[in-house]
Amino acid sequence: MIRDENKQKALAAALAQIEKQFGKGSIMRLGEDRSMDVETISTGSLSLDIALGAGGLPMGRIVEIYGPESSGKTTLTLQVIAAAQREGKVCAFIDAEHALDPVYAKKLGVDIDNLLCSQPDTGEQALEICDSLTRSGAVDVIIVDSVAALVPKAEIEGEIGDSHMGLAARMMSQAMRKLAGNLKNANTLLIFINQIRMKIGVMFGNPETTTGGNALKFYASVRLDIRRVGAIKEGEMVIGNDTRVKVVKNKIAAPFKQADFQILYGEGINTHGELIDLGVKHQLVEKAGSWYSYNGTKIGQGKSNVTEYLKTNPSIAAELDKILRNRLLNPVCEKDKTDLDPLDKIYHENSTAF
């Protein structure tokens, strides 16, 4: 017993010394860590927010979004920026590809007048800008588009054809070590867009890989694989893509879930279409033939008309969104149903299976 008391006193003294030297919060018991309640930002897609398990992308972490060309990578990140700006957050876009379209960004709801944008000359410059913005503590979301375009200075200044084996991977590895801690302290979300390459000579297994080495794979808390799986047509005209996102890595919730949604050209993610599909699936919206009803009231015939109804009635769309998020992100036990708010009760009165 005396030995245990001495150990506790020694531990308390050591903890006090560590906090004195490195600051309060430098060491703590895991259950006391307030950061366990992870703050998130919506991706702009309700289905993807649910698949991520926490309601969006986590603040203070590194996220990688990768996929083939024209699969919706930049569109998804612009939707994240729009969602963050609606919450009053400051966002920055590091445009290493020099391809950001401000007109398209504005159509997706991005406030381009308040979006910080940089078009760096080298990969080192881009990552230093990221680090400076992070250490300022004033920027909430940083997008880097893309890892493949982060060209090391030595490669830019060298001749075409010179060998620079592993140079980009070493640059990314050093940057990850430096950025990870600063992002956590500043509670800044850093999203890297990445491209896909094919490994030569692979006979079995997946020949696809991402650029920039392995460091980003290890340091990323969330990795999203985004693919175009079909075309959306209006008559003979293609107006968008059916998109599928797989959560291939997730440190804040269960991984390996997937989300399916539509990306419409010039509009972005079809959020109202998602609300209709999820509402029908979870018996919040009734479908009889081609007619849709909500709370006993017909709201339109055909999905396109219901989408227009939700656009012109944002309060109904917000109500549906809130109920779906409460039910699918924060499931409750049977004994807790008596404590639900009125919106949640609507769900349970109309749902027999959960």
From Swiss-Prot:
SMART domains in the cross-refs: AAA
UniProt keyword Coiled coil present: no
Chief localization: cytoplasm
An individual GO BP term: DNA repair
Record localization: Cytoplasm
Transmembrane segments: none
Molecular function via GO: ATP binding; ATP hydrolysis activity; ATP-dependent DNA damage sensor activity; damaged DNA binding; single-stranded DNA binding
UniProt key word Cell division: no
Keywords assigned by UniProt, alphabetized: ATP-binding, Cytoplasm, DNA damage, DNA recombination, DNA repair, DNA-binding, Nucleotide-binding, SOS response
Binding of ATP, residues: G67, P68, E69, S70, S71, G72, K73, T74
GO cellular component: cytosol
SUPFAM superfamilies per UniProt: P-loop containing nucleoside triphosphate hydrolases (SSF52540), RecA protein, C-terminal domain (SSF54752)
PANTHER family: MITOCHONDRIAL DNA REPAIR PROTEIN RECA HOMOLOG-RELATED (PTHR45900:SF1), RECA (PTHR45900)
Function text: Can catalyze the hydrolysis of ATP in the presence of single-stranded DNA, the ATP-dependent uptake of single-stranded DNA by duplex DNA, and the ATP-dependent hybridization of homologous single-stranded DNAs. It interacts with LexA causing its activation and leading to its autocatalytic cleavage.
Family per record: Belongs to the RecA family.
Protein name (record): Protein RecA
Lineage, top ranks: Bacteria, Pseudomonadati, Pseudomonadota, Gammaproteobacteria, Enterobacterales
Gene assigned in the entry: recA
